[in-house]
């Protein structure tokens, strides 16, 4: 009898020990898992950062994605020319009688181009891109707010892209614009950790979903396009609902940044202002109070180019009062960073980085700096890196 009890006790103890070991292994695995969220308004560069992580830490792009990119990139170009031709027709740029046919086709009936046979589609893209009116457009209005950012990369590469044997390069895929719908996650090993990086759609209609991913977030990477200072938000008044729902949770009223932009038409919101407001409402969110906040002030290359043609204080008059208001990229970036910091409670730390998400090495380096903070290495409270 005694022996039986002894055996049962030993078996129970063994079982307990096995369960303990299992729990310890699971806890350790969970500790290795780091959840990171990419947030920001649409077109800021979130998905581009995910692409760079895939290039750096996973297998990059597969064959299907590369083939699919041929069509997405050509549609990106058709959409860009649609806007460009529209602006041309409403400007003082001379359009010859011969040019008018295709310029009007792109401006008003671009859907028809997407339905053409590939050879015809390439013919019209090649023809229109060589027009004098298009060249003039790029000389005078390249940084018009209606011109998508990717065209600054695709236009000089059109000879290659609009040819029948085109195979997109990794760089082409990084510059390609594809709106994110829904929520996407990638997972990769980084030092001793497993990073779960979550990418969301930035459109107003998509933002309602964000709050469902706020639990257990180690770091928020908030991405803002520095080049968005002369752009407006997508106009979807209905979708403003999300902001009230997000703020209801934390019981706070959304505060607008002090130096906000001058807006030409009533009802329009400056995209940089929108980004700052969105950042502040997220930074204050109680679910994220334990998270590290990394601000990616992105598209620094486009900011530099844009400032050669556009005067920042025309959009943000408060910049005239800034210490160095020389319209240089450095001073404008500092002003923008300050817009994000203004009004933040001092204990709410934030690490800001100037980035160019289209450059693989730049994102690799910035991500390493962010991880130094997250994993607790020594780190000075940063200003722009
Ligand atoms: N020139 C330039 N283009 C960028 C940069 N970051 C992103 N883009 C481009 O901006 C567009 C929108 O980027 P995407 O990552 O889709 O934005 P999301 O809506 O925030 O996910 C794409 O065409 C990108 O290639 C950058 O630093 N410089
Ligand atoms: Mg995206």
UniProtKB/Swiss-Prot annotation:
Positions of region (G5 motif): 355-360
InterPro entries: Gprotein_alpha_su (IPR001019), GproteinA_insert (IPR011025), P-loop_NTPase (IPR027417)
Annotated region (G1 motif), positions in chain: 35-48
Binding positions for Mg(2+) per the UniProt entry: 47, 180
GO process terms (BP): adenylate cyclase-modulating G protein-coupled receptor signaling pathway
Region annotated G2 motif, chain positions: 172-180
A Pfam short name: G-alpha
Keyword Nucleotide-binding listed: yes
The keyword Ribonucleoprotein belongs to this UniProt entry's keyword annotation: no
Alphabetized GO MF terms: G protein-coupled receptor binding; G-protein beta/gamma-subunit complex binding; GTP binding; GTPase activity; metal ion binding
G-alpha domain: residues covered: 32-385
Keywords: GTP-binding, Lipoprotein, Magnesium, Metal-binding, Myristate, Nucleotide-binding, Palmitate, Transducer
CDD domains: G-alpha
Its biological purpose: Guanine nucleotide-binding proteins (G proteins) are involved as modulators or transducers in various transmembrane signaling systems.
Protein name stated in the entry: Guanine nucleotide-binding protein alpha-5 subunit
